[in-house]
Curated annotation (Swiss-Prot):
The gene is S100A9. It comes from Oryctolagus cuniculus (Rabbit). Keywords: Antimicrobial, Antioxidant, Apoptosis, Autophagy, Calcium, Cell membrane, Chemotaxis, Cytoplasm, Cytoskeleton, Immunity, Inflammatory response, Innate immunity, Membrane, Metal-binding, Methylation, Phosphoprotein, Repeat, S-nitrosylation, Secreted, Zinc. This is Protein S100-A9. It comes from the Eukaryota. Residues 119-132 have a biased composition (Basic residues).
Length: 132
């Protein structure tokens, strides 16, 4: 499926694949249990959620907030809410860190300051650190 896909399409595909990597381990196949969500946060989002990844209560609080139907599982739709929040926060951080005196639409490092090649529009698959 990855043949000829754009960078954005590959990114979407990656989010789906990572969700499926964790969602098939316990319980319903297409949802994350609390344990699966914790593993995903700690292994896949440890830079974006630095403090939360080390704090089980914080992970539980995030899951509770996302679990809109309160079934103690995160559906893909509920999980995507977290992805949207992280993308939004990273975008805001890029604008906050950007120098305000240059032209074009290249902004400084996103969450965590990734250095060259990690700015807005120049990602090469590297994450941006994030802490709340």
């Amino acid at each position: 499926m990855s043949c000829g896909m754009s960078q954005l399409e590959r990114s979407i595909d990656t989010i789906i694949n990572v969700f499926h990597q964790y969602s098939v381990r316990v319980g319903p196949r297409d949802s994350l249990s609390q344990k699966e969500f914790k593993q995903l946060v700690q292994k896949e989002l440890h830079n974006f959620l630095k403090k939360e990844a080390r704090d089980e209560k914080a992970i539980n609080d995030i899951m509770e907030d996302l679990d809109t139907n309160q079934d103690k599982q995160l559906s893909f739709e509920e999980f995507v809410i977290l992805m949207a929040r992280l993308v939004h926060a990273s975008h805001e951080e890029m604008h906050k860190n950007a120098p305000h005196d240059h032209e074009g639409h290249s902004h400084g490092p996103g969450l965590g300051g990734g250095g060259p090649g990690h700015g807005h529009g120049h990602s090469h698959g590297h994450g941006h650190g994030h802490s709340h």
